[in-house]
Amino acid sequence: MNKDTAKSYTALISSMLIFGTLGIFRRYIPLSSAMLALFRGLLGSAFLLILVFVKGGKLQKLKSRTVFLLAVTGALMGFNWMLLFEAYNYTSVAVATMCYYMQPTIVILLSPFVFREKLTFKKLICAVAAIIGMVFVSGILNGNGIKTRDIKGILFGLGAAALYSAVVILNKKVVVKDVYEKSIIQLAAAAIILIPYLLLTEDITKTSLNGTAVCMVLLVGIVHTGIAYALYFGIMKNLKAQSIAVMSYIDPVFALLLSAVILHEGLTVYGAIGAILIIGSAFVSEIARN
């Protein structure tokens, strides 16, 4: 392994570890999910824009159709984050993370209709395994019933997964050479679309944060979004798609570990089996696709 490849792997792993801590940070930020999503998009896009100019780059003029599609995917990202943050609020980080990682399964099931791709036997088995895993993770089989809060959290998590699936599908229709420019537009759109939503649903004048919360928000916007996106997209040309797909599963595994160690939200035996089925099926389907 040469030095450049080693640096790329280090950047990729670092970005996955950063993404894996997002649920923990969300627990300590006393903002509504919509407000946090807005700040994430705003700070993340600002950071990447500054990074592009510092590196001597400039934004290219894009076709109006491309900008429109990027704005739509960005808007979907904004509401996707909002639902994911709500999932973290209502259920454990572990369960919310597993719900969110149903996204590859949703894409697999939609692929025959959207991309005219054949649903192979391997992909079908992966989808069925993930759905069974979701049943295990949900707590239905624990015998104690599911709390209303957990049901809401699961639904928010699955909703976030569905929106992210839409982002993945639409992204395939958008061709932009500069991944930073693509991310800047999407992150900015995510923030902009949430402004009218917040004005209609919240009294933002009553929002107040202490010093710790402000630092947490800055970390989510700059580190979890700006820096993590820069690390992730900065290595895409240097590593094989399959390598990136494999390493991307550091994120949910690390999130599960942190949930257990820091928040003491360990999965039940059924939950652990479900997590293995969901992550395993997503992993196999990604490897097959790449």
Protein language model annotation of sequence segments:
Residues L31-F79, P104-V107, L163-V167, I184-E202, ...:
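Transmembrane alpha-helices of multi-pass small-molecule transport proteins
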Residues L48, V52, A71, L110, ...:
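Hydrophobic transmembrane alpha-helices of multi-pass small-molecule transport proteins
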Residues L17-L31, L36, L43, M82-T91, ...:
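Juxtamembrane C-cap of transmembrane helices in multi-pass membrane transport proteins
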Residues M35-L38, L42-A46, F85-K118, A160, ...:
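Specific alpha-helical transmembrane segments that line the substrate/conduction pathway
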Residues F39, A96-M102, L170-A191, T225-V261:
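Helix-helix packing/entry segments at the starts of transmembrane helices
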Residues Y9-L12, M16, L69-L70, G74, ...:
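Residue-level signature of transmembrane alpha-helical cores of multipass secondary-active transporters
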Residues M1-S14, A46-V72, K118-L124, N142-K152, ...:
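Membrane-interface interhelical linkers
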Residues M1-L38, L83, I146-K173, I192:
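Glycine-/small-residue-enriched transmembrane alpha-helix faces in small-molecule transporters
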